[in-house]
Amino acid sequence: MSPSWLTVFPDNIRSLLSALPPSVFGGLEEIRIREGRPLEINAGGRFCYLTSEGGMTLDAAKAFMPSKQECNRLLDLITNHSLYTMEEELRKGFITIEGGHRIGLAGRTVLGGGKVEHLRDISGYNVRLAREIKGLANTLLPQILDFKHKSVLHTLILSPPQQGKTTLIRDLARQISSGTWRHPEARWPGMKVGIIDERSEIAGSKRGVPSFDVGPRTDVMDGCPKAEGMMMMIRSMSPDVLIVDEIGRSEDVDALAEALHAGVRVIATAHGSNVDDLSSRPAMSRLLECSFFQMYAVLKRTDQGMAFRLWDDKRRRVQLPDGPAREAKGREVNA
Amino acid sequence: MGLLEKRRAGKLMLKILGAVMVIAAAALAGWIRSREYARRPNQIRRTILALRRLETEIMYGFTPLPDALLRIGEQSGEPIQFILSEAAKWMNSPHHRTAQESLQKAVQSGWKYTAMKNAEKDVLHQLSFTLGTSDRKDQLGHIATAVRQLESEEEIAREEQNRYEKMYKSLGVLCGAFIVILFY
C-alpha cells in the first residue's frame, strides 16, 4: 500500500515518486518542488533530481520541472481545497498534513503592520516526511533515569539539524509516558508527559489530535510558543515531564527555570554540535551557568543509525557501559 | 333506425374523446413549459441561498470546502444538493481532484436536472476557478460577485415567469382547441 502522503501530489509527480527504487523510496526525507525548476528529492542525506522518465540525475538541465498548474494542484490538495482555513499556517510558513508530515512553503509575503499577514504566490514546497521510529530512544533512556526520585533527569539533547532530534524525543515521550524504562531496576509506572509542540513536529497533531504514538499519558500543546506553552502546561496539566523542541531564546530559558522550581522534569533539544558551543550563545550560556540540566546528550547520525555521547552537569564525559558511543537503532513504523 | 342512431352517437362519442385528448395533451405541454418558467427563479434563489451559507461557512466556520458543500447541499434540496454533493465527492478521497475540476464536473453532470439556463451555469463556472484557492476575504469577494450576478439573473427569470407562465398555460389549451377545430 502506498503511504498517505503520496495522495497530495498531482498524478504525474505521484507516479514519478512511486516509480523510485524501493531503497530510495523508503529513505525519502524531503521532496522539494519549485515551480519551473527541477524536482528534487532528498533521501538518506543525499539529494538528486528526478527526470520526467522517473530516473535520478544530478544534472539540473535534464530534470523534470513542475509547472505552475501542478504547483497549484499540489496547493489545492494539501489545503484540502480550502486555503482559507490555513491562514494561520500560511503565516507560519508550513502546513501539517495527515501523518504528521510537514510541508514548508515559500512565496511572496503580504505584510500588515510590519508582520507577515499572508503568504501568496506560493511557488516553493518542501515536503518533509516525518518518520516514526519506535525504539530509537531504547539506549538513551536508561542513561537519563533518576533512580532516587523515580523519574528522569533534566536532559538537553544537542545536535545539528536533520540528525533525528525530533524523532528521538518523540520516542522518549512515548516510552516515558508508557513506563518502558529499558532498565531492569527501573520499576516505576509511566509518567505524565507534556509536549510543547510549537511547530507541530513532535506529535504531528492534526486538529489537536497527535498523528504519532506519543504514549498513553501524554498531553500535547500544539502550535504553542514554547515559553508560554511550558507555563500553560505547568499550570493546567500538571505534567511530571515536559518535553520541548529547539529551545534557544531567553524567554525559553526563563520558562525552563520556572519549570525547575515547579518540580517538573524537562527534556529539551537545541541546535549545536557540542556542549561548549552553548556557552557562546547568550541565552544558553545562562543555562550552563546555573547547571540546570543534569545530562547533556550530543547526537550524531551514522550509517547504522544514531549515536550519542553524554556529558553530566559538570560537563564531564559520561562513559557508557560498553564503549564511548552506542548505536541506537529502532524499528521504523510506516506512517 | 335504432341501429343508425346508435352508430351516430358512437361516432360522436369517439370524436369528443379524441378532441378531449388533443386538448389535454396540448394543455399539459403548455403547463410543463410554464412550470419551467416557475422553477428557474426558484432554483436561482436556492443557489443564492446556498452561496450565502457557503460564505458563512468560510468566514466564521473555517469549514473545509468539501465538508461545507456537503452540509449546505443537505439544506438546499434537489437539484442543488446533487451538484454540491457531487463536487464534494470528486474532491474527497479517492478521486482527489482540485476544487475547480470537481465543481466543473459536478455542474456538467448535474445541470440537466435543473431548470436554470446557461447564464447561471457560467456564474458557477467562473466561481469554480477561485473557490478554495485564496484567503477568506478574497473568497467572500468572489462569492459576493457570483451572488450579485445570480440575483440579476433571478430578476430576469422572474420577469419571464410573469410574462410567460400564464401565457404558456393558456397557449397550450388554445393550441389544443385550434387543432380540434381544424380537424372538424
Model regions: which residues?
Chain B
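Short alpha-helix boundary/capping motifs
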Residues: 36, 75, 82-86, 97, ...
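Glycine- and small-hydrophobic-enriched helix-loop-helix hairpins
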Residues: 57, 62-134
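A generic short alpha-helical patch detector that favors 3-5-residue windows
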Residues: 42, 46, 115-119, 142
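Hydrophobic packing residues in well-ordered alpha-helices of helical domains and bundles
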Residues: 44-47, 84, 124, 136, ...
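Acidic, low-complexity proline/glycine-rich segments
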Residues: 12-20, 111, 117
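Bilayer-spanning, highly hydrophobic alpha-helical transmembrane segments
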Residues: 19-29, 157-184
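Juxtamembrane/interface alpha-helical elements of multi-pass membrane proteins
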Residues: 15-92
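Membrane-interface, cytosolic juxtamembrane amphipathic helix immediately N-terminal to a transmembrane helix
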Residues: 2-10, 130-173
